[in-house]
Amino acid sequence: MGLLHEYAADVVWTGAGATGTTGYAAYSRDHEVRVAGKPTVLASADPAFRGDPARHNPEELLVAALAECHMLWFLHFAATSGVAVVGYTDRAGGTMRVEAAGHGQFTQVVLRPQVTVRPGGSAATDGAALDAQLADLHRRAHEHCFIARSVTFPVLTEPAPAVLETAGAGSAG
């Protein structure tokens, strides 16, 4: 049996106002996500569902969680493979279908990582060879991502061509 990890978060509704849920349009969807010892995340519903567009919504946070998990595993495999990643940006996106009855589900999330690599170490120096090497690291990251392994919809990875760091350059982003 594997090692179990447990996670806890408090979600606190802050949008009751004076009327609470006396009507569908009467209450705010604003809430806070609190985890002990960490900054509070101000959250709401997606604006399509009467949420505050200035706050994070659960759908965005799910897409972000998938992108973060993939990135962290990718960085792990890059480090253990001798590939010096110096920049990583993912412009991830998800698609959710909502049925006429109001229920819905994600149909897919697409991760679009852009990786900047420092030449040397075990990194390939040819563009195509480096892209193939990084594709293998992305494959391994996807296979290990706890969150991607926990969802029922496809999580696709469409990496951009790798960027080789040039002298004096910073990271991707």
Protein language model features and the residues they cover:
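Extended beta-strand/beta-hairpin segments
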Residues: 1-64, 72-173
